[in-house]
Amino acid sequence: MRNLSTLVGGTAAALTLAAAISCGGDDSNNSTGPSGSCTPSTNPATLVIQNNAICPQSITIARGGQLTIINQDSRSHDMTSDPHPSHTDCPELNQIGFLNSNQQRQSGNLTTARSCGMHDHSDPDRSTLKATITIQ
C-alpha cells in the first residue's frame, strides 16, 4: 500500500510540474508580456498580437517614430488609444484601428513625449490586449 501511495504522490507532482511548464510557468525572459501567450517581434517599434494577447505589453518609441502592430491572431482586433471609449490619449495610435488576421498597420508619427495606453476597442477589459507606449 505504501508503494502505491508513493507512486500516486509522485505522479501527481510530475503532472503539476508538467502543467506549470506548459502554461508558461517560467516567464523570466518575457517580463512585459503575458507568459507563454505571445512571441515579441525583433523590431523594437513593433507589437505583435497572438493568442488574444499583445506583446510586449510595454514599449518605448523615439519621438517622431511610428508604432507597428502585427495581428498574427486568428481573429480581428480594433486597436485604439486609451481611455475607452473616447480614445483621446494618443490620437496617432487610432490610425492603427481595425486589423484583420495576418494584417499589420502603423500609427501616425508619435511626436509628443508622453506615455499612452492602448487596448482592443472590441474587448476593452481584456488585460492581455492592453499595452503602454512610452514616447521619448
Predicted regions mapped to residue ranges:
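Acidic glycine-/aspartate-rich tracts in secreted/extracellular proteins
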Residues: 72-75, 83-87, 124-125
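Beta-strand cores of secreted/periplasmic/IMS beta-sandwich domains, seen most often
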Residues: 57-75, 80, 104-112, 116
